[in-house]
A protein has these predicted regions:
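Phosphate/adenylate-binding glycine loop and adjacent helical scaffold
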Residues: 1-104, 141, 174
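A short, conserved structural fragment
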Residues: 14, 110-120
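Alpha-helix capping/termination and helix-coil
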Residues: 81, 109-113, 143
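Residue-level detection of the helix-turn-helix DNA-binding "recognition helix"
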Residues: 107, 133
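Minor-groove-contacting beta-hairpin "wing" of winged helix-turn-helix DNA-binding domains
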Residues: 120-129
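C-terminal helical/coil "lid" or tail adjacent to the Rossmann-like core of SAM-dependent
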Residues: 134-140
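Terminal interaction helix/tail motif
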Residues: 140, 144-174
Length: 174
């Protein structure tokens, strides 16, 4: 498992597909080295892949010229996790932004035509939905670009090993 994950991390570092690897490069600074215990390696490689997924996602929407806060607001409404300013503020309280900041984010999204407002409720427009879907597709394209370093059999093995690893971790927590 560690060997397959390590190959993916190295392939992600080498791929030119995603414009930017800021999160991945920061995550790699915590690499414990190949001699580290396997659990530390697995933790590192999974963190690296998560960071690279963040890089891929950032690359997929940054060209729209909105802040991360505005994009996250769109995402929350797009996923049907919130529909009002109050719900948004409660859900993202941990981010530390003021209510006014989220009100401005919602206003910007309405002005861009990505959200529609009906009283206190917000919903995604067809345009906003198309942009968000496009970003998800681009994220996947960037993220999986380097996976051709593994054969189909190795990807199947990786899926199986990760599933078993996750089940084993779940069993230790019960």
């Amino acid at each position: 498992l560690a060997g397959l994950l390590g190959r993916l991390v190295e392939a992600n570092l080498a791929t030119p597909e995603s414009p930017g690897k800021w999160c991945l490069r920061i995550a790699r600074k915590y690499d414990p080295g190949v001699e580290a215990p396997v659990m530390e390696l697995l933790d590192q490689y999974l963190s690296d892949l998560s960071a690279y997924r963040d890089d891929a996602h950032l690359a997929s929407w940054r060209h729209h010229g909105v802040s991360g806060q505005v994009w996250e607001t769109l995402t929350m409404v797009w996923r049907h996790e919130v529909k009002t300013l109050d719900e948004l503020c409660a859900r993202l309280q941990r981010r530390g932004f003021a209510r006014e900041d989220y009100a401005l984010a919602l206003q910007e999204l309405v002005e861009r035509g990505w959200l529609a407002q009906d009283g206190e409720n917000y919903s995604v427009t067809a345009r906003g939905d198309a942009l968000r879907l496009e970003a998800e597709e681009a994220t996947n394209r960037y993220f999986y670009a380097a996976w051709d370093c593994l054969t189909e059999a190795e990807i199947a093995d990786l899926r199986d090993l990760l599933t078993r690893f996750g089940a084993a971790l779940k069993n230790t927590n019960e």
